[in-house]
Curated annotation (Swiss-Prot):
Annotated GO MF terms: N-acyl homoserine lactone synthase activity
Pfam short name (any one): AHL_synthase
Entry keyword annotation includes Transferase: yes
GO terms classed as biological process: quorum sensing
Enzyme Commission numbers on file: 2.3.1.184
Taxonomic lineage of the native organism: Bacteria, Pseudomonadati, Pseudomonadota, Gammaproteobacteria, Vibrionales
Name under which the protein is recorded: Acyl-homoserine-lactone synthase LuxM
Alphabetized InterPro entries for the sequence: AHL_synthase (IPR035304)
Catalysed transformations (reactions): a fatty acyl-[ACP] + S-adenosyl-L-methionine = an N-acyl-L-homoserine lactone + S-methyl-5'-thioadenosine + holo-[ACP] + H(+)
Record-stated family: Belongs to the LuxM / VanM family.
Record key words, sorted: Autoinducer synthesis, Quorum sensing, S-adenosyl-L-methionine, Transferase
Length: 399
């Protein structure tokens, strides 16, 4: 009842949008326990997603960022009030007054909830200086982030916090707030548990290490939860493009029984054969959520450094092949400039019909380590520029 009164008062208040946003977020964080908040957000998300798909069935397979912007959110909730509860109806009404849509609000709530647990303090050491020097950083593999006692800070919030919270906050800011990958909101728990690769800046004086990059590492034993095998990423809409030398490289790596993977003609067929024939299951993993911090130039540097450290750490850990999903042109242009056997696509798809291709592919860790062994950031950027220029010339030739 107290929440209803607060929401009613806030709804009628003519506060500036930014102020109303902050008051609403604070109210929700104070009112709900973490698990209660998650259940509420998931319920309303599912309700509105199903409703929007019913209204626009031709967009059923699009991403949440497309689906939730098919209709003005305020118009949606006025024309189709929630039937979940009176509380949900009033909450959505206030959200509609100050946020683009429900998922935008969910993301901002999760970011604020973490920052509220670890508020910035006055008289703290200044924010860490992020150098463009490889030796200032180190990569590591953490088996269970939920169990580690390691406390770190991140560049956007220089306050000590558990590693799992730092990874989650970084994922929220880069992928959800920045790239609008709202599907991750209901899967935030994956950022808080399990095996993760991290890149840390060595601590200076008494400050804690700074997390500048991370990635989720999932073993073959949990392949049923892999994004690579989710229906959206393994269907007939995908263009199959696994190269002939990929089959040879897999045979050389001794991954299968029989030793040679059967020739395939579609991505779903390839996925099925891979599962049936794989015998060295310890050699395979999926790498997702490669997250980097900092401003635009720092992110490019940490993207280079994270890949360099990632390949080395996973190769040393005994992995041979890593499934991955990539949209990042900077990464793809570099891969075009190195040995083709170091990274190869298995398929590509324009998921949202917006001209942007998403690629499923494989990192061959042994070959990737070799590719990065004699290259620094300057050489990395030079290779990317040359690859981009070469690609542009090739496109011009086909016009």
């Amino acid at each position: 009842m107290k929440l209803m009164l607060s929401l009613g008062s806030l709804s009628a208040n003519s506060l500036p949008i930014e102020k109303k946003q902050q008051v609403l977020i604070d109210l929700v964080i104070r009112t709900y326990q973490s698990h209660e908040r998650t259940e509420l957000f998931k319920a309303i998300t599912e309700y509105r997603k199903n409703q929007l798909i019913a209204l626009f069935p031709e967009h059923a397979n699009k991403s949440y960022s497309i689906i939730f912007e098919l209709m003005d959110y305020r118009d949606l909730i006025e024309r189709y009030p929630s039937t979940l509860s009176e509380e949900a109806t009033l909450l959505e009404k206030v959200v509609g007054q100050c946020f683009m849509h429900w998922l935008d609000f969910w993301c901002e709530c999760e970011i604020a909830a973490i920052k509220a647990k670890f508020p910035l303090k006055e008289n703290e050491l200044p924010a860490p200086q992020l150098l463009f020097e490889d030796s200032a950083y180190y990569g590591a593999l953490v088996e269970r982030v939920e169990d580690t006692q390691l406390m770190v800070q991140i560049p956007s919030h220089p306050q000590a916090m558990p590693l799992s919270d730092a990874i989650t906050l970084s994922n929220l800011e880069l992928f959800i707030q920045g790239e609008k990958w709202y599907e991750m909101l209901s899967l935030l728990s994956l950022s808080q548990v399990g095996k993760h690769f991290i890149v840390l800046k060595h601590p200076v004086q008494d400050s804690c290490p700074t997390l500048v990059a991370s990635a989720l590492i999932q073993n073959w034993s949990v392949r049923d939860t892999w994004l690579s095998y989710a229906p959206q990423f393994s269907n007939e809409q995908w263009n199959y493009c696994f190269p002939s030398y990929g089959y040879s490289e897999f045979t050389r790596l001794q991954l299968f029984t029989p030793s040679t993977l059967s020739k395939c003609y579609s991505l779903p067929e390839f996925d099925n054969e891979f599962k049936l024939q794989l015998s060295d299951t310890q050699a395979v993993c999926e790498v997702l959520r490669l997250t980097v911090s900092g401003n635009a130039q720092q992110k490019l540097y940490f993207l280079y450094l994270a890949q360099k450290e990632l390949m080395s750490v996973l190769h040393q850990a005994g992995y041979k092949i890593g499934f991955t999903i990539i949209e990042q042109p900077f990464m793809l242009n570099f891969y075009r400039a190195i040995d083709a056997k170091a990274y190869f696509h298995s398929g590509y798809c324009d998921l949202n019909d917006d001209g942007k291709q998403t690629y499923r592919g494989f990192w061959n860790f042994e070959m990737m380590v070799k590719a990065f062994s004699n290259i620094d950031f300057r050489g990395y950027k030079r290779a990317v520029r040359a690859s981009r220029k070469r690609g542009s010339l090739e496109r011009d030739e086909h016009v």
